């Protein structure tokens, strides 16, 4: 009986792991081109920004990339974003607006699976 419980837990873990792999593959299939790694992308019209001094509010090009890499890109593009946090996709989080925060929603492999946004 003990062995069956362990086997069920192992199978459940493997299902979660495999499903998170497929989620990251679909994000990588978007054909987003990141040339040499740490290129800075600029937004020319900052009048639409809801946060003063923030020049870019979202990074769709970071879908499918490792969280550590995404954090480096975001902080290089805008040093005012001092709070770049990583959350497992589906985790609970507060919905308050903070102009210094970007949340990276990742899968179990630490791959970004949602577009990172300021807030």
UniProtKB/Swiss-Prot annotation:
<dbReference type="InterPro" id="IPR036354">
    <property type="entry name" value="Prot_inh_pot1_sf"/>
</dbReference>
<keyword id="KW-0964">Secreted</keyword>
<keyword id="KW-0732">Signal</keyword>
<feature type="site" description="Reactive bond">
    <location>
        <begin position="95"/>
        <end position="96"/>
    </location>
</feature>
<dbReference type="GO" id="GO:0005576">
    <property type="term" value="C:extracellular region"/>
</dbReference>
<dbReference type="GO" id="GO:0004867">
    <property type="term" value="F:serine-type endopeptidase inhibitor activity"/>
</dbReference>
<keyword id="KW-0722">Serine protease inhibitor</keyword>
<dbReference type="GO" id="GO:0009611">
    <property type="term" value="P:response to wounding"/>
</dbReference>
<dbReference type="InterPro" id="IPR000864">
    <property type="entry name" value="Prot_inh_pot1"/>
</dbReference>
<keyword id="KW-0646">Protease inhibitor</keyword>
<feature type="signal peptide">
    <location>
        <begin position="1"/>
        <end position="27"/>
    </location>
</feature>
<feature type="propeptide">
    <location>
        <begin position="28"/>
        <end position="48"/>
    </location>
</feature>
<comment type="similarity">
    <text>Belongs to the protease inhibitor I13 (potato type I serine protease inhibitor) family.</text>
</comment>
<protein>
    <recommendedName>
        <fullName>Ethylene-responsive proteinase inhibitor 1</fullName>
    </recommendedName>
</protein>
<dbReference type="Pfam" id="PF00280">
    <property type="entry name" value="potato_inhibit"/>
</dbReference>
